Structures are given as structure tokens and as C-alpha cells.
């Protein structure tokens, strides 16, 4: 069993005590957790997946491949995955979907968890806490089926092209897709400038949205989506896209807003 009933926070707290110099015996007595469980967590903190219990059918593996039931949630999750997500294999043949979410934006963490749950209601979602961010994680053998952009190496080192069925979802839920891209790789910022009018220097502030990604393919997916939505944008430099026109910022505010 090795403490499978304990959540990630409890496991991490026990490991923190060990890291502070406490012995396994003393941590076990203090927490009531067996030494065997703590020792196992030193090797692997994540709960062991239910290898033989995978009841959720994959919509892409049906005789007639389909899409997730909640396509709006999928469009948002696709944006999150392309921004700060990855799919990593488990030695026994299944996969983890992991989305990195900064601790500074707890609302983003909850939105990410909700999207994963909506796309795969039968599965579990948990946060693996790291320094400054949470790795929102879900285990399923079919994650690569839903995110065929998964592959060896970093995203900016390989082509990122949506499958036709993904593009249909993004076309139907474009704002959700843009929100998913902005949340990990973008922000709403306030710039300012000064002007001298009649001998008086005045400060003017104006908001804008930024999106940054090393992958040219992902930046293109973002700007193509903005074009469909009627949002004006500019390529600020090699990696950054800027939305600064007042009407376009207002449109983004109505559908995206600041992270929280």
C-alpha cells in the first residue's frame, strides 16, 4: 500500500521534515506515517496510477473517432498545453499530462484543474507543488490521443500543427483557445508615457496584452485566432505579440481579462 491514501501535500510535508534532518523514525512517530511509505516517497512522491483500471473511453479511439464531450474546455486546455504543458510517459506504458501554473495565479490553477476534469471527468487531477508553481497533473493512457502535438524534444524544436478535428474545435471556441494561450504565456500590462501640453507634463497610461512563445508555430496559431476574432496585433519582436489598439484591448478585456 505504501500510503496511497495520503495526498501530495501530506507526502511533501513528511519529506520536508526528512530534508530538515529528522530521521525516518522521528518523522514516522510525529506524523503517524509508516517509514516504508516515507522511504517510498523519497523515490516517487506521486501516487501510483491505477494501471489496470482505466475505464474512461478515448473519444479518438472509437471506431468512428470523435471529440471530447466538452469541446469548449478542450479548446482552453489545448491552449494551456501548448503554452506550459507537457505529456510524459510512465514506464508501464501510460502517460501524465502536466500543466505548469504559477502560484501567483491561484485562479489559473483552479481553471486548469476544472478544464482537465471537464475533458476527462472519470479521471483524477492533483497538484504537484514545485518551487513557485504547481504542476497540475492527470494520469491517462490516452492523453497523446487528445494532444497529438506530443513528441520528443521541446515544442519549439518540432512542428506544431493542429489536426483537422482540433482546428474545428478551435474555430468553434476561439476565445477559449486564446484564453488558454494567454494564461500561461501572456499577460495584461499597463504601459505609460508622458506628454508636455502647454508647458505641463502629463502622464498617460494605456493597457495592452502581451503574448510570448519561442515556437513560431504556436505564435502563428495565436495570431490566426486573433485574426478570426477581429483583434488587431503586432509582432513586437522575435518572440512577442502585442495587442495595443484600444478597441482590440477592450475586446480582449471582455473575453480574457487579467489573470488572478
Give a label for each model feature.
Residues 1-260:
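Internal intein/HINT superfamily modules and their associated LAGLIDADG
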